[in-house]
Amino acid sequence: MAVRVDLNISLDGFATTTDQTADDPMGEDWGRLTAAYAATRTFRERVLHDPSGEGTTEVDDEYAAAYFEGIGAEIMGAGMFGLHANPDDPDWRGWWGDEPPFRVPVFVLTHSPRPPIDMANGTRFIFVDAAPEDVLERARQAAGGRDIRIGGGASVVRDFLKADLVDQLHVGIAPIVLGRRARPTPGEAGPVRTRRGTVRSRGRPG
């Protein structure tokens, strides 16, 4: 069982835009940051529920497929679930739709816990107010021996890295520069301990 982080970052190391609104929950630059990932066959099948077989393949699709492999539980922040879009609506079910791509228990970190939400495809959102170590222990119990993914956003990833709780970083680097956004790494808080890394790339024709 490994604790994994799978995310897309820009060339200057940013993983999240900072201009999210209720009407544009991902932010203006999110499409640029995740363009290669969102164009893959795996993303279209798993997230958009598109059975056509369309979408890119090769290294980008391998990255996207690896995102979902072997996951038994997920941990994410309230923003990634979408709580800030409708914070006062107890019936708000997030912006992932009726069939979220996770299909496993998802622990949502929030200072305002609410009852769990069960979705039709096996996804269960569980809202907790807990430290990284404590929610990770709950996720381990729910994961059934499979891996646990720290899904984001950037501040949640940063907290788990600072606590030295991450075993694997699985990163797709987009060829863009975002400037001042949100970094997933601790920055001035101290170094991140690394274990092993491999690199694959896709060149641009010409």
Enumerate the predicted regions with their spans.
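Enzymes that bind and transform nitrogen-containing heteroaromatic metabolites
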Residues: 1-206
